[in-house]
Amino acid sequence: MNETTPAFDRHMLEALVCPVTQTVLEYDAEAQELVSRAANLAFPIRNGIPVMLTDEARPLE
């Protein structure tokens, strides 16, 4: 993350769940993603805002 990228507020993790499984998410700071191990999906964080759309999620390998 550089100085022009807004930081993700980790307190948001307390309120957010996976939109597919309704399970907890993990924050991957390096990839700027919220990861759902239950759904095997990674949701992008853009400009500090999580994009919780399944169409925008990346499948985990």
Swiss-Prot record:
GO cellular component, one term: cytosol
Lineage: Bacteria, Pseudomonadati, Pseudomonadota, Alphaproteobacteria, Rhodobacterales
Protein name (record): UPF0434 protein TM1040_0056
InterPro entries referenced in this protein's UniProt entry, alphabetically: Trm112-like
Domain of life (superkingdom): Bacteria
Family: Belongs to the UPF0434 family.
